[in-house]
């Protein structure tokens, strides 16, 4: 069974939508990605889980997958993924808006292909982010899309959060 292979370590990346980093509250998970690191073959495989998938969450019954984290933290999310999808998770990493931006900025940004409709759609989540980060309105807006655009952390987060352009949550999961 590849999901329980001793040469493979599965790391769950949890993207939390928590905006206030000064609270102990949990947000929902906007992104849930599993990185499978194969030590033998020296390969990495990434699997995305749809946040709105309807699953059984322990004693809470049926709900959207992203509610598992909100209800019981990373442990309940792990249990739900393991029970529903049959995956084995060895470790997890949680990022929120601020840490996501910091990681992308630390590596010098990320190159992405961005369509014109995506560039326009990014303005709404970026307006919220700019307010949270005490940045001037309009900061980091893209004038238009393009190929291999160098996005900073704020722009990359807005791109990853974009959900009402294209095929809704399916394209959002692809962007993440």
Regions found by a protein language model. Give the residues of each.
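Non-catalytic, solvent-exposed segments at the cell envelope interface
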Residues: 1-176
């Amino acid at each position: 069974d590849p999901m329980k292979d001793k040469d493979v370590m599965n790391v769950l990346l949890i993207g939390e939508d928590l905006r206030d980093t000064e609270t102990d509250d949990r947000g929902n998970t906007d992104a849930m990605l599993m990185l499978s690191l194969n030590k033998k073959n020296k390969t990495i495989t990434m699997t995305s889980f749809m946040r709105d998938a309807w699953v059984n969450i322990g004693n809470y019954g049926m709900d959207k997958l992203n509610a598992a984290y909100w209800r019981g933290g990373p442990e309940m999310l792990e249990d739900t993924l393991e029970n529903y999808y049959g995956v084995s998770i060895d470790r997890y990493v949680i990022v929120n808006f601020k840490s996501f931006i910091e990681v992308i900025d630390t590596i010098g940004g990320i190159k992405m292909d961005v369509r014109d409709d995506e560039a326009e759609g990014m303005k709404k989540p970026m307006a919220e982010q700019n307010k949270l980060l005490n940045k001037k309105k309009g900061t980091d807006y893209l004038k238009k899309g393009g190929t291999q655009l160098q996005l900073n952390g704020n722009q990359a987060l807005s791109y990853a959060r974009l959900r009402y352009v294209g095929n809704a949550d399916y394209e959002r999961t692809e962007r993440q």
